[in-house]
């Protein structure tokens, strides 16, 4: 129905038919209308049911008591702000005032989009390209500043250059910069030293893969008396500052061993790898034939141009997800619309269009 829609209401009606999985439907037309709908069939739960705890399916009280009408779903139609955006964040555009639970990301991307879009009115296709390619994460800057506050930099005089770089970091992930290289290594070891003794190595590595880690790290850092800071296997009680300092020491030693004594050589580019997998490339040696490798990209977590990776202790970060397509469409000049795919239009390894867009995707 969406493909055959001729009005905004037609699209809304079609979106109301989507039950699961939940989708964000974004809309715009040549008349200047814009809209966003959270499309899903949302259950009405009893007060005794908690969305994050397993429920007894045999208990009638745990069953849905009904379904909210689509008109109560989170949505935004021609808002006064003049824009709509979605970045897998907790929506607040609900008519009923209900905040529906879900696996939402923290909101850094949406906040950055909203902040940037509302900062100017003279948007052009070129400036929108810049926004789509932006790799700034303001929350990471806050985390880095907090970590730096916990240590006496006089104890790390040998590493004054890299610490100064991190102190001046604005959250970008430019490939030639060194601040991200230190930040993510330091972040990993701080969390590891705080948590691994309580939940074990396997549990900690599993924790790093969760939404909880992404959403709670800043809050975790702010609790000085948090019991996580104390190591269970020692007779003394470690403090937050001691754990953060130890994590920095380990991080600097590992980066020196990994990239050399010259701190200016610790560029983010050297810590990032990119490979677009093909179903037939899952097993070696077919990966060398079917998978598409590219130059390094500005890997990051939760920026507008999200090129995500899993935090780990190796100091090498493999990009695991990114924009499936970038597209800019001007309804006043549709013929000049532009788009790019991560690799190419064809899934046929022997087609000339199999990977002919990979460089353009990397460069933007």
Regions found by a protein language model. Give the residues of each.
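C-terminal/peripheral segments of proteins
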Residues: 1-164, 168-364
């Amino acid at each position: 129905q969406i493909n055959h829609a001729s009005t905004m209401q037609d699209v809304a009606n079609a979106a109301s038919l989507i039950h699961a999985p939940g989708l964000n439907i974004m809309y715009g037309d040549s008349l200047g209308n814009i809209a966003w709908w959270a499309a899903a069939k949302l259950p009405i739960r009893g007060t005794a049911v908690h969305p994050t705890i397993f429920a007894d399916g045999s208990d009638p009280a745990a069953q849905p008591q009904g379904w909210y009408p689509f008109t109560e779903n989170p949505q935004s139609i021609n808002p006064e702000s003049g824009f709509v955006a979605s970045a897998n964040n907790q929506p607040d555009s609900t008519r009923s005032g209900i905040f529906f639970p879900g696996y939402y990301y923290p909101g850094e991307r949406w906040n950055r989009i909203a902040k940037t879009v509302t900062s100017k009115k003279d948007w052009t296709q070129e400036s929108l390209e810049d926004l789509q390619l932006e790799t700034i994460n303001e929350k990471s800057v806050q985390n880095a500043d907090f970590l730096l506050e916990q240590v006496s930099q006089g104890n790390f005089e040998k590493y004054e250059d890299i610490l100064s770089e991190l102190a001046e970091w604005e959250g970008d992930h430019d490939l030639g910069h060194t601040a991200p290289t230190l930040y993510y290594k330091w972040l990993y070891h701080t969390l590891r030293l705080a948590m691994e003794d309580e939940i074990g190595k396997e549990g900690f590595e599993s924790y790093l893969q969760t939404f909880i880690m992404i959403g709670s790290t800043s809050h975790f850092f702010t609790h000085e008396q948090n019991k996580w800071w104390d190591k269970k296997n020692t007779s003394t009680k470690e403090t937050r500052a001691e754990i953060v300092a130890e994590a920095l020491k380990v991080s600097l030693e590992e980066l020196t061993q990994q990239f050399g004594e010259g701190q200016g050589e610790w560029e983010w580019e050297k810590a990032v790898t990119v490979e677009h997998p093909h179903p037939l490339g899952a097993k070696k040696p077919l990966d060398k034939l079917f998978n598409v490798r590219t130059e390094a990209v500005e890997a990051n977590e939760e920026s507008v141009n999200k090129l995500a990776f899993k935090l780990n202790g190796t100091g090498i970060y493999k990009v695991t997800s990114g924009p499936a397509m970038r597209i800019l469409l001007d309804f006043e000049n549709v013929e000049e619309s532009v788009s790019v795919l991560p690799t190419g239009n064809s899934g046929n390894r022997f087609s000339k269009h199999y990977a002919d867009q990979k460089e353009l995707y990397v460069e933007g």
